[in-house]
Amino acid sequence: MMQDLRLILIIVGAIAIIALLVHGFWTSRKERSSMFRDRPLKRMKSKRDDDSYDEDVEDDEGVGEVRVHRVNHAPANAQEHEAARPSPQHQYQPPYASAQPRQPVQQPPEAQVPPQHVPRPAQPVQQPAYQPQPEQPLQQPVSPQVAPAPQPVHSAPQPAQQAFQPAEPVAAPQPEPVAEPAPVMDKPKRKEAVIIMNVAAHHGSELNGELLLNSIQQAGFIFGDMNIYHRHLSPDGSGPALFSLANMVKPGTFDPEMKDFTTPGVTIFMQVPSYGDELQNFKLMLQSAQHIADEVGGVVLDDQRRMMTPQKLREYQDIIREVKDANA
């Protein structure tokens, strides 16, 4: 929008300047033609009385009406001679007086000159002063000059447009749209989870059934539902089950007579939420697993059957807290 406004202002200014130049040129031509047209003829020499001095009057390129000098044929009359002398002073007009075309109409000084003293040959001298005044010929040389005036008007905006053309690529580069990060959706909190530990024999060996049974009973497990062992709230087997122990080999069940029984390991698991404090139950579960591993000569593994580490224990605790918060 601003570029279009500036372009319009430049075009209007160019038109105004060209109009002023054409008007000034036309006025100068008009004044110059009027000056050459009104240039008067050389004045005729007049001889005056023997007592007066002869003077040659000639306008130095004066522009104005031709003066008519009176020729006195009666030199004897001194009074008339003296009265006629001041008349040329009144008839004298400065050269710039004729610049105004209508001033020759006013001729009060000539009325003071008696008509009897004005010679007849002076009349044709006045005719060329009035003949070159028609205004129609002045318009003819001016009219063809006005016609080419619109041509520079059309050419003037061209440099202006060229001046604005390089301004287009100067536009500031738009910043690339920055993709807003998608809102991070909070993971739904777990409503329940299963914490799993394993007690396994060393590589290439198995756990003895009789030693395993004694260690399980010492840890407070009691054989029960689904043919697996459970750790209840009370050591005598009363109360809800806190966590359970199953065989690592499918189907995961046990035979109560475990004298001739061997296995590569057992799995201890706890469902969360559970009865009581889940974190306290988890500590009790970890202690039971360590006790059984010490008794049978095995190791405690995580749910991926890797060595249990402090980081994995903290991960189990975080899961328990998450479930507790989800069910709070």
Curated annotation (Swiss-Prot):
Keyword tags: Cell cycle, Cell division, Cell inner membrane, Cell membrane, Membrane, Transmembrane, Transmembrane helix
Stretches in topological domain Periplasmic: 1-6
GO biological process: division septum assembly; FtsZ-dependent cytokinesis
UniProt keyword Cell cycle present: yes
Ranges of Acidic residues composition bias in the record: 51-63
Superkingdom to which the source organism belongs: Bacteria
Region annotation (Disordered) ranges: 42-186
Residue ranges, compositional bias (Low complexity): 100-115, 123-171
Residues that span the membrane, as ranges: 7-27
Pfam family, one: ZipA_C
Record bears the keyword Cell inner membrane: yes
Record GO cellular component, one term: plasma membrane
Positions on the Cytoplasmic side per record topology: 28-328
Membrane topology: Single-pass type I membrane protein
CDD domains xrefs: ZipA (cd00231)
UniProt family annotation: Belongs to the ZipA family.
Subunit structure: Interacts with FtsZ via their C-terminal domains.
Function according to Swiss-Prot or TrEMBL: Essential cell division protein that stabilizes the FtsZ protofilaments by cross-linking them and that serves as a cytoplasmic membrane anchor for the Z ring. Also required for the recruitment to the septal ring of downstream cell division proteins.
Entry protein name: Cell division protein ZipA
Naturally occurring in which organism (per UniProt): Escherichia coli O157:H7
